[in-house]
Design a protein with these regions (language model features):
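ABC family nucleotide-binding domain
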Residues: 1-174
Length: 174
């Protein structure tokens, strides 16, 4: 389903990704482990086109992309098949949990608001936050904020979800 070959990325003289290869089959759960600063986040960001790789190739669902030469249109199209749960969650501080989940569906995917709300509520229920849909991020614990970010990701029904530091704030009961 997803294959990355020879991916390279440098920041100035610092080579962070040195011809990394990775293959992930449908249904696989893959963890990338390493010390701080070893390129884990950079790899995920390059695979989701949030960072431009210096080289390499990405194959996804039978499509081949030369990293470093992917058009904005192709990157956006591919991103619609994926979701990214950021280390700092990237929630909108002025929006409720439900609004954080539905915003991308309504604005990005042009989904009718009523349908987005229904999907958003289902996603919040899956992560155990249906009773917190009207809470703002400042009213939620770190683990609850991360679960809102996870709900936002699963609401889009992606083929792949990238998690950056997925266990950093999760509550033990999830």
């Amino acid at each position: 389903m997803l294959e990355v070959t020879q991916i390279r990325k440098s920041f100035g003289d610092l080579e962070v990704l040195k011809q990394v290869d990775l293959q992930v089959n449908k249904g696989d759960v893959v963890a990338i482990l390493g010390p701080s600063g070893s390129g884990k986040t950079t790899l995920l960001r390059c695979m989701n086109f949030l960072e431009t790789a210096d080289g390499g190739e990405l194959n996804f669902d039978g499509e081949r992309f030369l990293l470093g030469h992917v058009s904005k249109k192709d990157a956006a199209r591919l991103r619609k098949k994926t979701a990214f749960v950021f280390q700092n969650y990237n929630l909108f501080r002025n929006k409720t949990a439900l609004e954080n989940v539905t915003e991308g569906l309504i604005i990005g995917r042009k989904m009718p608001k009523a349908e987005a709300i229904q999907i958003g509520r289902q996603a919040l229920e899956k992560v155990g936050l249906s009773d917190r849909e009207d809470y703002y991020p400042s009213q939620l614990s770190g683990g609850q904020q991360q679960r809102v970010a996870i709900a936002r990701a699963i609401a889009t029904k992606p083929e792949i979800i990238y998690f950056d530091e997925p266990t950093s704030a999760l509550d033990p009961e999830l």
